[in-house]
Design a protein with these regions (language model features):
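ATP-dependent adenylation/pyrophosphate-handling site
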Residues: 6, 24-74
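Soluble or luminal CAZymes and related metallo-dependent hydrolases
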Residues: 10-14, 104-112, 159-163
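RNA-binding accessory domains that recognize and position tRNA/RNA substrates
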Residues: 1-27, 47-49, 170
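Structural preference for long, well-ordered alpha-helical segments in enzyme cores
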Residues: 14-18, 36, 40-45, 70, ...
Length: 206
């Protein structure tokens, strides 16, 4: 049974957006979290290229655990980019310098992405940030930093979680995976404990 026409069209739009983002790179990278958006990009992207899934986080974090399960279940090529307190604070300090107009909370969403960019500096890095969950400012900052965000260029960036879920299930994602709850990037990577903001802006050292 075919999916609703809008889901079929959405998947085709995602395929085109990924092709543009990959830009002919033979081994692009996906900043992977195990969330719905990154699962959808992984499902589409690996059919079109030799996709590597890099997950940045603290050992034992939700994102790393989900990525390892995805590797076992779907045979994704998963690599871990380990983070610790010192690494997180170094990256956060750099983001403060590069993006002074963002709030501390907004910059915290970019820490795992910056970690993946630093691990894979010479190839296209994709991520699943969406306009619905993340502010326009965060998306623009991520793209200025070098991350490619295919879902921001589909449906004007206003892609709902339900649309992503329906598309992923249409492509074969099991229902149990489709029920994964949303995690913020800092929560999923397990780095929120290292990021403390005074008045919502300044990074404090523990």
């Amino acid at each position: 049974m075919r999916p609703p026409r809008r889901i079929d069209a959405f998947v085709e739009d995602v395929e085109r957006a990924i092709d543009v983002a990959v830009d002919g790179q033979p081994r692009p990278v996906l900043a992977f979290s195990g969330g719905l958006a990154s699962l959808l990009l992984a499902m589409v992207g690996r059919k079109r290229s030799d996709l590597r899934c890099l997950v940045a986080g603290v050992e034992g974090s939700a994102d790393i655990a989900a990525a390892k399960r995805a590797k076992d279940s779907f045979e994704y090529r998963v690599e871990v980019v380990p983070l610790d307190a010192a690494r997180v604070r170094t990256i956060a300090a750099g983001l403060t310098t590069d993006f002074p107009g963002l709030t501390g909370a907004q910059r915290s969403a970019l820490v795992p992405l910056r970690a993946v960019l630093l691990r894979a500096p010479d190839t296209s890095v994709l991520a699943g940030l969406r306009g619905v969950r993340h502010s326009v400012e965060v998306g623009r900052a991520a793209e200025r930093a070098g991350v490619r965000l295919p879902l921001l260029h589909v449906l004007g960036g206003g892609v709902s979680r339900e649309t992503v879920r329906s598309a992923a299930m249409y492509l074969g994602l099991p229902a149990a995976w489709a029920r994964v709850r949303h995690r913020s990037p800092s929560e999923g990577a397990g780095i929120a404990q290292f990021l403390r903001h005074r008045d919502g802006e300044r990074l404090l050292r523990r």
